[in-house]
Amino acid sequence: MTPLLELKDIRRSYPAGNEQVEVLKGISLDIYAGEMVAIVGASGSGKSTLMNILGCLDKATSGTYRVAGQDVATLDADALAQLRREHFGFIFQRYHLLSHLTAEQNVEVPAVYAGLERKQRLLRAQELLQRLGLEDRTEYYPAQLSGGQQQRVSIARALMNGGQVILADEPTGALDSHSGEEVMAILHQLRDRGHTVIIVTHDPQVAAQAERVIEIRDGEIVRNPPAIEKVNVAGGTEPVVNTVSGWRQFVSGFNEALTMAWRALAANKMRTLLTMLGIIIGIASVVSIVVVGDAAKQMVLADIRSIGTNTIDVYPGKDFGDDDPQYQQALKYDDLIAIQKQPWVASATPAVSQNLRLRYNNVDVAASANGVSGDYFNVYGMTFSEGNTFNQEQLNGRAQVVVLDSNTRRQLFPHKADVVGEVILVGNMPARVIGVAEEKQSMFGSSKVLRVWLPYSTMSGRVMGQSWLNSITVRVKEGFDSAEAEQQLTRLLSLRHGKKDFFTWNMDGVLKTVEKTTRTLQLFLTLVAVISLVVGGIGVMNIMLVSVTERTREIGIRMAVGARASDVLQQFLIEAVLVCLVGGALGITLSLLIAFTLQLFLPGWEIGFSPLALLLAFLCSTATGILFGWLPARNAARLDPVDALARE
């Protein structure tokens, strides 16, 4: 009869300083299907090392070990994991159940790594627990079960994928005599069902119940009676068959890894929350700075637009501060008419200004009087709270009419509800009020200077007595390049004057400078916020590294029941990403609260969240999880299952 497990001259040595300590010294052993074998020996005799090699948790230094004719030395790590998953079931002295999983969930773990569908897993786990008398304990956690019940859960887990070979390491060592007898009775039943049962023990009474007792001493077999030949041995029971297609198996495996990661995080809620805190603050900082910074930029640009955007001012002289008399009369009314005819001009308004006294009844105030055209208010985006602007008839007739700003209205008419039609003195000229320009709220503040506007023909002809203009403001049509328009304007006036006795001031350049400045400032603040996100990511990495250390035994258990290194890597990586994703979602929520609070205190700000900003925040948190979760996950995947199981 061909042995199920065949060992020939197995040796296992470990480094100890500069030397090699040989634990197993030429072990040769055959174990047949359906046998119940006990391996006995004193502590340090090498029986646990032999069990680890039998269960494919460890590899021999030399020699040959075959499982059902397959030489395990030719198998890589994933193939060994598959061999453990499909052929072996482990029963440990300390049960080695995962504390954050219920009895039913613990039993399901081997089938998760076998790729069995959830419904099939659940039915099989319930069936096994019922067979072992735990049908009313399926939802209990290990801490709620007695030692005997925990060991029965461990046995059910060993049988989940079929458990052709049951490896029991001191299965009764931590139990009272009654529970120990129950466990041994179950092992006898498994033997009767066709399982191969290998018990590692130092208890003579337990060993006596086996069909064959193999004694090991100082790494050598000193007693090995011949096997009892069995007829019609099934060689195990109900092996689990996975019929799920490759793609569905991948999706199912990912979902299970996600579920296991969530359970692991939920088992340590406070630590998980504290780990998330750095990500929450980082994401909230990034999103808030981007969103609030954008709102502030729009507010600044709106204030600049209120001054007049897409406009070009033309002044006499060579530059600001040039008071050369030969240039002061450079701009004429004919220049204004020529400019208004250009195809790229939306509107053009002249300006003639002088500081004058305004009087109404017994109120006498100083103000800046500006002679403009009716287009002036359109050029600067100003609206009216009362009345309207000048019409062409008033401009042509040098009408004695005036438009007030809201500050002037309050000074001259503090108690009047409607001031249109009232007459005031502008200098020594009576003028009828035809409108009140609405005050624009600006983050730069309001001007302290009182301002009034008259038709430029009235201002120059009736008030100042001059035939030239102090300046011309041109509004460029939408769609035309402001810089190109400025060049054409300069060319036009230079041809008309025969020389360049004027200079221009393009507000579009100011706008672009402000936009560049705000972008730079926003980038700087975003980088500061990103640093806080990186700090949060490092916090995640530190906690995950600690988690790997704390959960080393759990990793060993998962590997013992068939988890591949990639399964462990995936689970810990998903845990890190999950922490960062949930932290990112909470960070976005926090940034929404910050924005809502700012909106209450700054009603003029338009704070909005674009879908792109939210998507980038989620991508950022996911990338943080992958980046800073990789090292801990890799460390977890590289753990040796024997070393991992040995740690507490």
Swiss-Prot record:
Source organism, top-level taxon: Bacteria
Entry keywords, A to Z: Antibiotic resistance, ATP-binding, Cell inner membrane, Cell membrane, Membrane, Nucleotide-binding, Translocase, Transmembrane, Transmembrane helix, Transport
Listed GO biological process terms: response to antibiotic
Gene Ontology molecular-function annotations: ATP binding; ATP hydrolysis activity; transmembrane transporter activity
Gene3D superfamilies: P-loop containing nucleotide triphosphate hydrolases (3.40.50.300)
Domain called ABC transporter: residue spans: 5-243
PROSITE patterns: ABC_TRANSPORTER_1, ABC_TRANSPORTER_2, MACB
Compartments, as annotated in UniProt: Cell inner membrane
GO cellular component: plasma membrane
Main location as per UniProt: membrane
Enzyme class: translocase
SMART domains registered for this protein in UniProt: AAA
InterPro entries given in the database record: AAA+_ATPase, ABC3_permease_C, ABC_transporter-like_ATP-bd, ABC_transporter-like_CS, MacB-like_ATP-bd, MacB_PCD, Macrolide_Exporter_MacB, P-loop_NTPase
Enzyme nomenclature, EC number: 7.6.2.-
A Pfam cross-reference name: ABC_tran
Membrane topology value: Multi-pass membrane protein
Transmembrane spans: 273-293, 523-543, 576-596, 600-620
Positions that bind ATP: G41, A42, S43, G44, S45, G46, K47, S48
Family label: Belongs to the ABC transporter superfamily. Macrolide exporter (TC 3.A.1.122) family.
Record note on quaternary structure: Homodimer. Part of the tripartite efflux system MacAB-TolC, which is composed of an inner membrane transporter, MacB, a periplasmic membrane fusion protein, MacA, and an outer membrane component, TolC. The complex forms a large protein conduit and can translocate molecules across both the inner and outer membranes. Interacts with MacA.
Function in brief: Part of the tripartite efflux system MacAB-TolC. MacB is a non-canonical ABC transporter that contains transmembrane domains (TMD), which form a pore in the inner membrane, and an ATP-binding domain (NBD), which is responsible for energy generation. Confers resistance against macrolides.
Protein name: Macrolide export ATP-binding/permease protein MacB
Gene: macB
